Swiss-Prot record:
Name of protein: Cyclic pyranopterin monophosphate synthase
Active site positions: 127
Function: Catalyzes the conversion of (8S)-3',8-cyclo-7,8-dihydroguanosine 5'-triphosphate to cyclic pyranopterin monophosphate (cPMP).
Gene3D superfamilies in the cross-refs: Molybdopterin cofactor biosynthesis C (MoaC) domain
EC number annotated for this UniProt entry: 4.6.1.17
Coiled-coil ranges from the UniProt annotation: none
């Protein structure tokens, strides 16, 4: 299989999408962060010294999605029309799951924007709570679903 990000001299390039049709694109990604009971309680009780952790993580996730083309070399800058987040608590596991959905009308997909949003949001939680628990684990960052474009629909089973 020929890689689209390499030219005939095997040099990196950004893929030319100028001939592609503009279609509705949507992608959802998720990831988990596991922590100690103490760190989990600080987040739940909103008593972190650095401020409201989950609210800050949501803002960071949105910013991460919007800035994807600046940190992932071959990503095209996209005009996003929606970035939506959700955070689920897992009390028994002392964990949070961050879910990010990104949408645009464009010539290329938004999977990387959704994945970047999740990554930056979870890293923000880590940053804000690391004084309490440096052993936190960020895991399972993955694409849940995507629609649009020639590759069609994908839903993780």
């Amino acid at each position: 299989m020929k890689l689209s990000h390499l030219d005939e001299k095997n040099h990196p390039k950004m893929v030319d999408v100028s001939d592609k049709n503009i279609t509705s694109r949507i992608a959802t990604a998720s990831g988990m962060i596991y922590m100690s009971q103490e760190a989990f309680d600080v987040i739940k009780n909103n008593t972190a010294k650095k401020g409201p952790v989950l609210q800050t993580a949501i803002i960071a996730a949105i910013m991460g999605a919007k800035k994807t083309s600046e940190i992932i070399p071959m990503c095209h800058p996209l005009m996003l029309s929606k970035v939506e987040t959700d955070i689920m608590e897992f009390v028994k596991e002392c964990a949070f799951k961050l879910i990010v959905t990104v949408k645009c009308e464009g010539k290329t997909g938004v999977e990387m924007e959704a994945l970047s949003g999740v990554s930056i949001g979870l890293l923000t939680i880590y940053d804000m709570i690391k004084a309490i628990d440096k052993s936190m684990r960020i895991t399972d960052i993955l694409l849940e679903s995507k629609e649009g474009g020639k590759s069609g629909k994908f839903v993780r089973s």
